[in-house]
């Protein structure tokens, strides 16, 4: 596999150098021109194609390694390859896929529950017991929890932590109830944890959790939790496309993820991001570039940022240093949207990205200002596909329009829409289809993407050179991410919202 990766890198670089001058006859891309070449019809047509892939199969989703996801990957590869403008390859990798069926009854009444990804199977009938506080330390767990089903509030720590601590306390299983309105999906982040063995674990709604607590306070409550988890290894692919022209030693990278959750086709999450990037990539073919542009389409984001982590970790230090910046586009057309920019300078959430991230944030701020659109920052905590880039000192930024977080009155005044309603009420649900896209946000953010691509394809003068003085130490950033509170004020969303709180 190492040899294969080196061959990819060698061929990629050599092709770029060999073919670069052949594109010089085209006019240089301009940040005022490229955005005007992005049209809503093209965006909607691409999104419809993704929905068609999902609905062609009984699963009606685009989970990584499934048939509709394979169709998505092959579609992106073909569309980019046929332009002749890019060197395109599919990067193979093997990751563990899992799904589950489940049922929860309490004193004979059925409740909706969602198994957390990577949970073990279980069929347990046992008393429910409330865990103190947020279940993030051993002291929160009652001494008499052995054989019982732990009932835990969402918040503060990862679901994996709650699962492991439940197991250590002897619980037969765990239920985590939401801390905001609505149901809850989650993941343990991986098949195993260095913290210890998992207890079977599922999520329930805030309303159901509160109702169960009241029942427990009135007397003994018996629950049956049945989880049937299925696990298999799946071969899947990233799609990487780099311009044949432009300096391959100064690469502008951008990306989004190609997979959905099991519940639905994922047309906003993240069909919006990958189709936007594809439309921008096609428009770019009419121009020449000074700096190489690399479009990245990541697999298995919903299972733990697997595709982007695999890719960045496959690059040696020399190849990583060629990537001058990374732009992330995940959920850019939420129906009740807010226009949000990742907080690269740390002014809003006290977590600063690698040197250059602040400049990326400023570029998007300037663009929104130029088209008279308001904007707000969103938390840059590394729990999206930019994580691997940040941890390796690569500056990052991007756009986001919100997930399950509730729109505030202030946001409604800025962006319109309905206060008191989720930014994306169909987040991680079967309703994330074509009807879930806000067309205005889709077009605004796709043109913002084009503006950024055209700007950086022309000049990277605003981005500091990559060297040891500009690299954020990995350990420092990881610790900062762990300390960052998850308050839902930034819209949350996607994988990062499923691993904790």
From Swiss-Prot:
Zn(2+) 2 binds at residues 269, 302, 428. Keywords: Aminopeptidase, Glycoprotein, Hydrolase, Metal-binding, Metalloprotease, Protease, Secreted, Signal, Virulence, Zinc. Binds 2 Zn(2+) ions per subunit. It is an enzyme of class 3 (hydrolase). Pfam families: PA, Peptidase_M28. GO terms for cellular component: extracellular region. Coiled coil: none annotated. Residues 119-216 form the PA domain. Its EC number is 3.4.11.-. GO terms for molecular function: aminopeptidase activity; metal ion binding; metalloexopeptidase activity. The keyword rRNA-binding does not apply. PANTHER family: METALLOPEPTIDASE M28 FAMILY MEMBER (PTHR12147), PEPTIDE HYDROLASE (PTHR12147:SF57). This is Probable leucine aminopeptidase 2. It comes from Aspergillus fumigatus (strain ATCC MYA-4609 / CBS 101355 / FGSC A1100 / Af293) (Neosartorya fumigata).
């Amino acid at each position: 596999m190492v040899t294969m990766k080196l061959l990819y890198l060698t061929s990629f670089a050599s092709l770029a150098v060999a073919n670069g001058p052949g594109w010089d006859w085209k006019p240089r891309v301009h940040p005022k021109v490229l955005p005007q070449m992005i049209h809503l019809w093209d965006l909607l047509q691409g999104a419809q194609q993704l929905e068609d892939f999902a609905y062609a199969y009984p699963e009606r989703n685009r989970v990584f390694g499934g048939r509709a996801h394979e169709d998505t990957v092959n579609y992106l590869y073909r569309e980019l390859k046929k332009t002749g403008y890019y060197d395109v390859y599919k990067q193979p990798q093997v990751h563990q896929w899992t799904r589950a069926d489940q049922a929860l009854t309490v004193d004979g009444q059925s409740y909706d529950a969602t198994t957390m990804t990577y949970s073990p199977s279980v069929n347990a009938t046992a008393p429910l017991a409330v865990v103190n506080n947020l279940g993030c330390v051993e002291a929160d767990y009652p001494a008499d929890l052995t054989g019982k089903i732990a009932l835990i509030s969402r918040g503060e720590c990862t679901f994996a932590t709650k699962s492991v601590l439940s197991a250590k306390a002897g619980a037969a299983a765990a239920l985590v109830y939401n801390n905001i309105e609505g149901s809850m999906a989650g993941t343990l982040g991986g098949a195993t944890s260095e913290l210890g063995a998992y207890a079977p674990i599922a999520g329930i709604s805030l309303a159901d959790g509160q109702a169960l607590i009241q029942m427990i306070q009135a007397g003994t409550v018996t629950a049956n939790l049945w989880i049937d988890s299925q696990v298999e290894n799946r071969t899947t692919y990233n799609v990487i496309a780099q311009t044949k022209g432009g300096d391959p030693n100064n690469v502008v990278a951008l990306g989004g993820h190609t997979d959905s959750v099991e519940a639905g086709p994922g047309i906003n999450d993240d069909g919006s991001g990958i189709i936007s990037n594809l439309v921008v990539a096609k428009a770019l073919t009419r121009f020449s570039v000074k700096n190489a542009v690399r479009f990245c389409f990541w697999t298995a984001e919903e299972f733990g940022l697997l595709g982007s982590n695999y890719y960045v970790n496959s690059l040696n230090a020399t190849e990583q240093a060629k990537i001058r910046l990374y732009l992330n586009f995940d959920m850019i057309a939420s129906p009740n949207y807010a226009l949000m920019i990742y907080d690269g300078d740390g002014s809003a959430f006290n977590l600063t990205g690698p040197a250059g991230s602040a400049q990326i944030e400023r570029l998007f701020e300037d663009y929104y200002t130029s088209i008279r659109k308001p904007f707000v920052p969103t938390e840059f905590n590394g729990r999206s596909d930019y994580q691997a880039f940040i941890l390796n000192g690569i500056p990052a930024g991007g756009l986001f329009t919100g997930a399950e977080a509730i729109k505030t009155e202030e946001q409604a005044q800025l962006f319109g829409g309905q206060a008191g309603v989720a930014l994306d009420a169909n987040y991680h649900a079967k309703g994330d289809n074509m009807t879930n896209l806000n067309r205005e946000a889709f077009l605004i953010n796709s043109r913002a993407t084009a503006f950024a691509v055209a700007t950086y394809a022309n000049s990277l003068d605003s981005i500091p050179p990559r060297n040891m003085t500009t690299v954020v130490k990995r350990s420092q950033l990881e610790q900062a991410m762990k300390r960052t509170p998850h308050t839902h004020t930034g819209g949350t969303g996607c994988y990062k919202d499923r691993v904790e709180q």
